[in-house]
């Protein structure tokens, strides 16, 4: 059985190395218009290279390229629309609608993909937070009930933590 990445490549999507497509829906019909860089994670989101809103009236759907750079994370429930470029080192927050180009080194959220900070600042902030918060080195699916109980208490007190 082919992986999601292999299926996308077979449909013409250009995909780099170290790409995770976690329940992501990639526009297979227009895969040749989509490029995904290296070190990209797309979680439970949709990437579209077409817009069929014109099809009934005009007999044609609008199409456009989608270019996703390197070192990009696209959060749960996001929608990437046609004719956009997402730069390098970008975090697209959960539920974001990307309908315009996103520059390098930013974090965007919301229905208008509002820039709320830089990728570098976000990573630095979390790197420092890891020194204060619980960090679990046991994969979530391998934790025992006792490990979950301990982690829950620590995460509740520290208002967050980190897991593999």
For every predicted segment, state its role.
Residues 112-115:
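Conserved switch/coupling elements of ABC/ABC-like ATPase nucleotide-binding domains
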Residues 78-92, 96-100:
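Beta-rich strand-turn-strand
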Residues 73, 91, 107-108:
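Short-chain dehydrogenase/reductase
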Residues 1-71, 78-80, 88, 104, ...:
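Domain-scale signature associated with acetyltransferase and cell-envelope carbohydrate enzymes
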Residues 64, 94-97, 107:
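Hydrophobic alpha-helical segments of small multi-pass membrane proteins
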